[in-house]
Amino acid sequence: MSAKKTKKGKKEKDQDLINFMINGQPVQAKKGWTVLETARQYGIQIPTLCFHPAVEAIGSCRLCVVEILQNGRSRVAASCITPVQGGVEVLTDSEEVLNVRRWILEMLLANCPASHQIRALAKEHGVTSTRFTVEHPEDACARCGLCTRACDEVVGVRAISLGNRGVFKEVTAPYHQRSTECIRCGTCLYVCPTGAMEYLFPQVSAP
């Protein structure tokens, strides 16, 4: 292969990459990558709860928020579902981001106070209490849907789902009975980020 063709191939390859900044560091990403994917490629840590690379991201927990600066404007977005854009600057630990993240962790402390993982994550961010009402002190489920998505997308069974809405949302099996579709593979236990499936699994898994 000639040097001319090699240079042309490299140029075309470079044109497929998107250039932007994360925390002042120049980065490159492939078209279709998210901000979170790119950050992880460069070893930049962004906390997540509902994200797992094996399933489609939905950005439900919002813990992975980042600040995006573009054309003199700023916005906060969930990095796991935000595609990269050329020329923008992303901040993963700005004061705006940290304030939003702390507020989310306060909400999580109120919604799933029994989760050791949530309490540890909150403590890392300086959150040791919540201003919100704790309705169920024994609850550890964040309703992130990671377990149900893994059951559907990875296992292909759909043995469990998120039932009800709002504050009544819960991980359940059809008709609120133990699932006859469950193959007891334990995938939901493995991906659960809060430890809630440890007590939910016996309630929803196959008899």
Write out the residue ranges for each language-model feature.
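N-terminal cofactor/phosphate-binding cores enriched in small/glycine residues
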Residues: 27-76, 85-86, 99
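Short glycine-rich loop/turn motifs that provide flexible caps or phosphate-binding loops at active sites
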Residues: 23, 31, 58, 165, ...
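Short, conserved secondary-structure segments in the cores of folded domains
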Residues: 25, 57, 178-181
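Fe-S ferredoxin-like electron-transfer domains
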Residues: 3-8, 62, 66, 72-184, ...
